[in-house]
């Protein structure tokens, strides 16, 4: 275990917060440009659909105001290693991080909430400053202990082979083990959860699916002592997406995860589609996904790969290179005669069998508040796929604990326009950090949806 509270990592976290909030360091124009907008006024116009109802909602919601800017307390952040296992029983050693306030004099301290945060890897240079580190200081200063698994290091070190299966479930179980290890570290430093405290389980993007599997495990399999220790109140799953190019980007072209990304895309059709019970074959749907003209650009429909080339040209080359290099080095039978990945090859089919066995949400009826948020503007994962997830978890809308919200946001554009990932991350993070109860969450979303 290594303390990192005074290192450059934590200084970067504090500086990112200062940079965002202080006009002395970050002018409105610079702030707007950082978010992809040409001017501050353009930024205001872009965020108006969500900003106005957002602040109106906060005025009518009970918000925690006891931010702890006290000299007798300090922020501690620890990276640590912990033991876990995969769904097929392989032992792995993973890493995570926990950040919390504690008393400088060593006296016991109680936090109001535990915040489980599953997004990208927390060491990723592109996303860390804009999402994890921007919000983590706020949550910690709101007297929340933030627990984060390092998904990137896990993936690169323990890339799942075709016979391993169930990567989202892997991450869910490892999030549980990460939480136990973090609670032990907190206890060693005299930090515990208040008697009326609770846990929020937040995940977006690549973390959205593991977050839901963790929530399912908590409701259906977690031991009683674990549930009593966490008191999970709400799960927030937003902008769930694991397309091939995104995993490539966030793992620096690691070929194992490029291959995994292709199969995880398939998993959405297996795990989230009610129609799978009627005989849908994911192996047939994935090629259709890549070849159907589903995206509109300049008034015309284009395919998934065309959209990838249009919106993310810098990623396309690494995606193709990574996938083919993996096949050439490890699994040449994955390639068809024309050099494309063959969804029908035995290794891919083995993955599908594992995913069908392990990655299933149809048999889970959530016993705590679950919020699923998505933006129709997000081309990374179509809104209709996320809506199928909601229908599955809510029993066609019959479970009042499951909520689906369409969050207004701008389309993803290389120049101008806010990334829906950022908007929903902001909404979800702030909501989980400052709102006292699920009733207020529902009140908020009824206004903004």
Model-derived segments and spans:
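Alpha/beta-hydrolase active-site loop
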Residues: 165-189, 215
